[in-house]
């Protein structure tokens, strides 16, 4: 049995790298827009206000992403991973009412449901960046 193990053939997920890149691009885009459209001549004040606005907007987008992910299929995937830990540990406190084959079927269906989830995050980032640009111009 040990000789027939196969390596993990799942494709790598680059979602975290893409999301981090989007956040960095958003931060500098908002920063440049607020500097460009600012009406005062004091460069220190402009940079300080622009950095604060950019940081707060990106931080709010991160919070929004966390809320959305917890309320959708990623939250369900997290519950499945907790259940998987109980199966591996054989916990006497939490006896699962489901077999391991049923668990594998459920986890694969959750993976299929969450495959296109990054599009929803991307649309939220775009909407948030548009709102932040409008707010920073006021």
Curated annotation (Swiss-Prot):
Chief location: membrane
Superkingdom of the source species: Bacteria
Keywords assigned by UniProt, alphabetized: Cell membrane, Membrane, Transmembrane, Transmembrane helix
Transmembrane segments: 17-37, 43-63, 117-137
Assigned GO CC terms: plasma membrane
Compartments in which it is found: Cell membrane
Membrane topology: Multi-pass membrane protein
Protein name per Swiss-Prot or TrEMBL: Uncharacterized protein MG076 homolog
Annotated organism of origin: Mycoplasma pneumoniae (strain ATCC 29342 / M129 / Subtype 1)
